Amino acid sequence: MDTSFFPGNHWLFFSVDLLVFLVGLPLNVMALVVFVNKLRRRPVAVDLLLLNLTISDLLLLLFLPFRIVEAACGMKWILPFIFCPLSGFLFFTTIYLTSLFLMTVSIERFLSVAYPLWYKTRPRLAQAGLVSGICWFLASAHCSVIYVTEYWGNATYSQGTNGTCYLEFREDQLAILLPVRLEMAVVLFMVPLCITSYCYSRLVWILSQGASRRRRKRVMGLLVATLLIFFVCFGPYNMSHVVGYVRGESPTWRSYVLLLSTLNSCIDPLVFYFSSSKFQADFHQLLSRLIRACVPWTQEVSLELKVKNGEEPSKECPS
């Protein structure tokens, strides 16, 4: 990797990955709790799809510490090499799972509004489970190229190129990698983007004919969050695939726009939040419980500190 592209660039990677981990992990854990409880009470297809998206985000976040360690070490891979392709495989798989599941959610939302009677007569939950399995298969099958690339040409390869992990590539590796990246940009990004854009544009038009203001506002929030993920988080990264294929090389700036892709695990909870009013209510309820659980503990600690310092605890609230 060209370290002259950004002075001290590994600290940029370290800071962004650490921030995403600290913000995204608690948000997605809370979303996981909400969706599990919702599915236990009343299973709905869209909630099953969003649950899979949450699990995908959590996988990315749980393996993000590997990238944090890598960045702290100057973008050199010091961990056992077996974790290099594994962390890369899970990292990129979850990125493309996001685009696929956002597409399926948009289709589900569109069908429920455009064809409500037909929608209610279909076994949506079973279909959602099947679609989820297909999404996991498509994303993981495409991203398995990471294993092919890292071990290509030498079955006993014990370290990446120049001691890095999936950052620098030999010519024989690029010959395999670049065409697959182009296909991923088309199949796993551009196609989902087109389908998602169509579904939400139609959904907004239908709701503009007579839906309540609150429902229109929720759908617009869902639309903005979804398009933000596609265009800001995933757009520049997938454009690097097209540029790399045309130029016959892995662009130097690819790793930097990849940072934007990691932000999706922090933005996805916005999609969850605007997905339904029931999720908003359950999320607020869970958040209130957490706050109530933490506040007495902080008050108790504060009281103990006052006693230790010889101060008399206040019995009245200030007016």
UniProtKB/Swiss-Prot annotation:
Source superkingdom: Eukaryota
GO biological process: adenylate cyclase-inhibiting G protein-coupled receptor signaling pathway; cellular response to fatty acid; G protein-coupled receptor signaling pathway; glucose homeostasis; inflammatory response; mucosal immune response; negative regulation of blood pressure; negative regulation of insulin secretion
Topology Extracellular: residue spans: 1-15, 65-98, 149-183, 240-254
Molecular function per GO: G protein-coupled receptor activity; lipid binding
InterPro entries recorded: GPCR_Rhodpsn (IPR000276), GPCR_Rhodpsn_7TM (IPR017452), GPR40-rel_orph (IPR013312)
PROSITE patterns: G_PROTEIN_RECEP_F1_1 (PS00237), G_PROTEIN_RECEP_F1_2 (PS50262)
Membrane topology per record: Multi-pass membrane protein
GO cellular component, one term: plasma membrane
Effect noted on mutating residue 252 to V: Reduced activation by propionate
Keyword Endoplasmic reticulum: no
This protein's UniProt keywords: Cell membrane, Disulfide bond, G-protein coupled receptor, Immunity, Inflammatory response, Lipid-binding, Membrane, Receptor, Transducer, Transmembrane, Transmembrane helix
Membrane-side (Cytoplasmic) residue stretches: 37-43, 120-127, 207-218, 276-319
Subcellular location: Cell membrane
Keyword set includes Cell membrane: yes
Cysteine disulfide links: 84-165
Tissue and organ expression note: Expressed in the sympathetic nervous system.
Major site of localization recorded for this protein: membrane
Transmembrane segments: 16-36, 44-64, 99-119, 128-148, 184-206, 219-239, 255-275
PANTHER family reported in the protein's UniProt record: FREE FATTY ACID RECEPTOR 2-RELATED, FREE FATTY ACID RECEPTOR 3-RELATED
Family: Belongs to the G-protein coupled receptor 1 family.
The protein's role, per its UniProt record: G protein-coupled receptor that is activated by a major product of dietary fiber digestion, the short chain fatty acids (SCFAs), and that plays a role in the regulation of whole-body energy homeostasis and in intestinal immunity. In omnivorous mammals, the short chain fatty acids acetate, propionate and butyrate are produced primarily by the gut microbiome that metabolizes dietary fibers. SCFAs serve as a source of energy but also act as signaling molecules. That G protein-coupled receptor is probably coupled to the pertussis toxin-sensitive, G(i/o)-alpha family of G proteins.
Protein name as it appears in the record: Free fatty acid receptor 3
Organismal lineage: Eukaryota, Metazoa, Chordata, Craniata, Vertebrata
Name of the coding gene: Ffar3
